[in-house]
């Protein structure tokens, strides 16, 4: 029999949500706001932005990002230049999670990572490898949950991102 302590789990989830909310509130100012945003990985979108989510027969909030199917361990790249404002290895819902502030209130998020390769305070460039695709947190298989937000308002990445990230080695 599985022994689940629901109050403890709920307390941990609330604590993690506060960590995420506080990270998203951090202001980051850049004189040279990125003009281009790229997809962080090549892959098929397995769940689009805004999709209705039903879990155990109960309607949930709309999907706040896009899920991109990709092989376990595939490189995840920064969508644009920015500052890492959160790098966590194991959050309950989102597993390995990175948030990057790009200036002007724009933040990108990368979740379910098997490996987080940056730390809080790191400056990254578009195309830098920041993590590896995984199935951590509440995930049913390997994929990247990718989000973009502007001042805490979720934005559909399809309207902002160009093709996949440039190769930083070239």
Task: Tell where the protein language model's regions lie, with residue ranges.
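Non-catalytic extracellular/periplasmic "stalk"
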Residues: 1-44, 48-49
